[in-house]
Amino acid sequence: MGKVLDGKTFANLLGQNLKEKVKKLKDEGITPHFCVINIGDDPASKIYVRTKKRRAEKMGIIQDIYQMSADTKQEEAIALIDKLNADPAINGLMVQLPAPKQIDTDALIERIDPNKDADGLTPANIGHLWMDKHFVEPATAEGIIALLKHYEIPLEGKNVVIIGRSNIVGKPLAALMLEQNATVTIAHSRTKNLGEITKKADVLVSATGQAFLVKADMVKDGAVVVDVGMNHVDGKLVGDVDFDNVKEKASYITPVPGGVGPLTVQFLMEAVVKLTRRQNDR
């Protein structure tokens, strides 16, 4: 039976350290200031934004939420980003995804000043990520690497399979896994014989948003299984992995909730503080 990788407890441990860093900044008259732009009425997005705000407050970070209507025009969102980019009091900035169909989210992300890019998703920061010269990284990917290191799970020379090729999780996680000298395979919706590929994984990460996609017969004995999925089934939050059955085969496994999710929020806060320190030559 696999050991559960407790992301929530680890996130709280990191939070204690981050609060101390924020306190030291405040003692010098510097308070990290973070802005989230949320466009539209997506219920899940509103929950995520509130979760970030609660975490920011706990860390001592100021977080402003800019809630824009579902009929917001592209130029209105661009104008807000330009305003926040130009404001020296703002240290970190992100656009909550998804956005309404009329919004070109790639263009919004490209508009963010890379020095204020808390999500690490601007082309400049993604480029630095692939060149191993990164300063901030997409939070979920960074959180996964940190969690595996926390539990002293080796990655060098391991076969890592990532299901999902998003710019937010799959691709940046592949870059960070390569940096750890893992051998990386990315699978996706067009991948054939998925189970044959996943059974070769020493570390299997699923980030698809498909409930119970990963079954026990797709996992080799002793594999490390990381579940990034967040899906609602019958009123319950579940992951991409059939947890109860896969747990019997895995050596380590993350739960949903309480696994990767808390670390995503925590590492977003870590990024805001890193950006704040750099902007103030700390």
From Swiss-Prot:
GO BP, one annotated term: tetrahydrofolate interconversion
Pfam families: THF_DHG_CYH, THF_DHG_CYH_C
A single cellular component GO annotation: cytosol
Name of the molecule in the record: Bifunctional protein FolD
Similarity field: Belongs to the tetrahydrofolate dehydrogenase/cyclohydrolase family.
Subunit structure and binding partners: Homodimer.
Catalytic activity line of the entry: (6R)-5,10-methylene-5,6,7,8-tetrahydrofolate + NADP(+) = (6R)-5,10-methenyltetrahydrofolate + NADPH; (6R)-5,10-methenyltetrahydrofolate + H2O = (6R)-10-formyltetrahydrofolate + H(+)
Function summary: Catalyzes the oxidation of 5,10-methylenetetrahydrofolate to 5,10-methenyltetrahydrofolate and then the hydrolysis of 5,10-methenyltetrahydrofolate to 10-formyltetrahydrofolate.
GO molecular function: methenyltetrahydrofolate cyclohydrolase activity; methylenetetrahydrofolate dehydrogenase (NADP+) activity
Species of origin: Lactobacillus helveticus (strain DPC 4571)
Keyword entries, A-Z: Amino-acid biosynthesis, Histidine biosynthesis, Hydrolase, Methionine biosynthesis, Multifunctional enzyme, NADP, One-carbon metabolism, Oxidoreductase, Purine biosynthesis
Sequence positions that bind NADP(+): G164, R165, S166, S189
Catalytic activity, EC: 1.5.1.5, 3.5.4.9
InterPro entries registered for this protein in UniProt: Aminoacid_DH-like_N_sf, NAD(P)-bd_dom_sf, THF_DH/CycHdrlase, THF_DH/CycHdrlase_cat_dom, THF_DH/CycHdrlase_NAD-bd_dom
Pathway assigned in UniProt: One-carbon metabolism; tetrahydrofolate interconversion
Disulfide bond annotation, renumbered to this chain: none
